[in-house]
């Protein structure tokens, strides 16, 4: 279904401006029109509390020399700068050849939030993307 939405309506495609910005950052990987699931567990922020919730979407994932970006529909839902110290606390794994799992603690990116957020992306070559994340250049590597 996600491929159909992508091909017919462009849902899950990065905006042109974002694509140009990513190209300038040294785009290592880009997958558009992919299925993704976002899951919140024991999530709290302000007055909102979620014990467990999942949301499916069509989106895109990109990895550059500077950041990891995930879009759901046409909105950015995850934008992690590789220079951010919290990036080292993000768990990226490949539970099967076509699934990429990105798990993080909400508090690492928002001091007013708590709980766990997991993104599951159905992307061809997920293992290669997970490997790129593991081998990314960290700020300490530059010095």
Positions of the model-derived regions?
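Anionic N-terminal interaction surfaces
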Residues: 1-60
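Low-complexity, intrinsically disordered/propeptide-like segments
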Residues: 25, 85, 103, 132-135
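Phosphoinositide-binding peripheral membrane targeting modules
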Residues: 42-116
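Canonical phosphoinositide-binding patch of PH/PH-like domains
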Residues: 107-131
């Amino acid at each position: 279904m996600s491929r159909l939405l992508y091909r017919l309506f462009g849902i899950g495609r990065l905006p042109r401006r974002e694509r140009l910005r990513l190209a300038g950052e040294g785009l290592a990987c880009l997958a558009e029109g992919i299925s993704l699931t976002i899951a919140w567990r024991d999530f709290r922020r302000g007055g909102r509390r979620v014990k467990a919730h999942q949301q499916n979407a069509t989106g895109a994932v990109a990895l550059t020399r500077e950041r990891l970006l995930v879009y759901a529909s046409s909105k950015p839902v995850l934008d992690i700068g590789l220079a951010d110290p919290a990036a080292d606390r993000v768990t990226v794994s490949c539970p099967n050849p076509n699934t990429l799992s990105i798990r993080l603690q909400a508090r690492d990116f928002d001091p007013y939030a708590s709980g766990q957020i997991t993104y599951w992306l159905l992307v061809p070559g997920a293992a290669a993307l997970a490997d790129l994340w593991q081998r990314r250049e960290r700020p300490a590597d530059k010095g």
